[in-house]
């Protein structure tokens, strides 16, 4: 990692995006105290010294890789163990997090008998004991089925919205991260390539018409003449992107047919997080 400096507003959901080996898990492990830096300096909540950082970590909860718990004992007893370990007073804290993550009716169940989705919920419950301000999650939906993914997504959104908990998480499922995160950090080779909000991405990446025609050069010429616009890009594969289209999609189809050009593809699209990330990796020319 090299000078990774992120700023996250209270209650935001911060999505870390990057290829395998980019540094996502290493960064989250450093934040949560699972590993320590060989060199350099870590700052957390404005604190620099190891002693102060350890104190600040009381304000955090984390699930890194597989949640750790004892499979032979009940959900409730596992949480009671972690409550004591964290020095959180009052058994009521266990009941509160069980209710929060939707495990109150399964508290007597042994952990080995839980589904994968329920185990993920238990991991979150352990992280939430002590009412952390910051939740650090590494691949929280990894291995879940579609219904489990939806359950965890809804839970994290509720924690952010109702409890004002700040969440930093990584996920290789960018379509899911797109539905959850309010701000993104793109990591490349251990460096923060860009930090941008979901709203800023939306503003930079407006709807566009994607069209493949038999004669792209002639099509763009008649496009300019007919609609008085230069808001288009011709990609290396000759695909045309008409940015901020002012006409309905049928008008662009008629333009081709009136000028005797064949269309192989024509659709209205919105730039996805995956497309934005791939463009950023390739130099960030498309959506600058």
Where are these regions (language model features)?
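ABC transporter nucleotide-binding domains
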Residues: 1-169, 174-188, 192-194
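Short, flexible turn/loop "capping" segments at secondary-structure junctions
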Residues: 36, 57, 201-204, 233-234
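Generic structural marker for isolated residues within well-ordered, non-membrane alpha-helices
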Residues: 79, 94, 156, 198, ...
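Secondary-structure boundary motif
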Residues: 103, 158-162, 203, 225, ...
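Conserved beta-strand-loop-alpha-helix hinge in the C-terminal portion
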Residues: 191-214
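Short, charged/small-residue-rich alpha-helical element at the C-terminal edge
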Residues: 207-280
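ABC-family P-loop ATPase nucleotide-binding domain
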Residues: 283-288
